[in-house]
Amino acid sequence: MDEGFELRLIEALQPVRGFALAQGIYHLFNSGLYERLADGPQEVPGMSASLGLDASRTSGFLRYLANENYLALSGDTVALTEKGRALGPYRPWYELLVGGYAETFQQITDVLNGKGYATRDGRLVGIGSCGMSAYDALPLVRELMSDLPAAPASVVDLGCGDGTFLAGLVDGSGTVTGIGIDPYAPEESPAEGLRFVRSGATDYLREADTPESGPDSSQICLAAFLLQEVLEQEGRGAVVELVRAALRRSGHLAVVEVDHRPADPQVMRHGLGLAYYNPYYLLHVLTEQRLESDAFWRELFQEAGARVVTRRVADPRVDSTGLEVGYLLTRREGAAQ
């Protein structure tokens, strides 16, 4: 064996280290351990007992993360390091990519063999997506709404997930009510002025009453990362009809989608391009979702009789790739509906 083998082995195992570490960080959050440690140093036996965890196994798990410098262990006392504490704001990305899609990555070979789409944990995908949106999509939609002729009286979120995105839009407004539509929508409203309907967007719009007087100019519909799912699951025609139906009901439709540019070297040389969008693009190849380009969506909106009032991208301080795009749509004058 040549003397360089071990060095090459260490390099070859770095993706395995990353795989285990991503799982470890996700479960640090998911187990409730992170919240306890965020309050300050804890005694492992007492913390484990209060969370219903096995103390011996928990100690081994915490030791693993201490070796990666996310925790500091001294006897039975454990605390977050500065590196560990800094993880807090990024929890939603782990909930989405690890919690929501861990099972998806395990099915890659099956999908390549043509055995259908890979599965995912829809509940955790929704939780992670809503949490991430507080940093990118939520401010983006607020900017789109600022371009409305007047502040809306109500918002209909056609793919609301766990409802936190919608709650963030209406929180503190006092005059705005929200309706959340999603198969995984909460059974009960977490706040006054919100109500939820457990339904798919196309079914809801098909069954909803269209105002006899025309679109309600005081209402806006929202489709954040929704059209990509309808496109793959129900086809282009269903997306066109969804846009038309939303604009028959409401004065405006806000859409947020991801520009599909996986073969663009400029994107893939970007740090966030490799860290987030490269796996994100892969996941959409494997699951029942379909990303498309900015040009594709513009053409589809035209076909649906919609006019793009304004187009914006996510805050570059959060995402400077320009890939997360928001559109504010209204009915094009004279277009068939």
Curated annotation (Swiss-Prot):
The record's section on CDD domains has: AdoMet_MTases
Pathway involvement of the protein, from the record: Antibiotic biosynthesis
The UniProt keyword set, sorted, is: Antibiotic biosynthesis, Methyltransferase, S-adenosyl-L-methionine, Transferase
> What reaction does this enzyme carry out catalytically?
5-guanidino-2-oxopentanoate + S-adenosyl-L-methionine = (3R)-5-guanidino-3-methyl-2-oxopentanoate + S-adenosyl-L-homocysteine + H(+)
BP term (GO), one: antibiotic biosynthetic process
Protein name as annotated: 2-ketoarginine methyltransferase
GO MF terms listed in the record are:
methyltransferase activity
Which EC number applies? 2.1.1.243
The record, for NCBIfam families, names:
ketoArg_3Met (TIGR04543)
List all membrane-crossing ranges.
none
Q: Which gene encodes it?
A: argN
Main function: S-adenosyl-L-methionine-dependent methyltransferase involved in the formation of the rare amino acid 3-methylarginine (MeArg), which is incorporated into the peptidyl nucleoside antibiotic arginomycin. Transfers the methyl group from S-adenosyl-L-methionine into 5-guanidino-2-oxopentanoate acid to yield 5-guanidino-3-methyl-2-oxopentanoate, a precursor of MeArg.
Q: Which protein family is it in? A: Belongs to the 2-ketoarginine methyltransferase family.
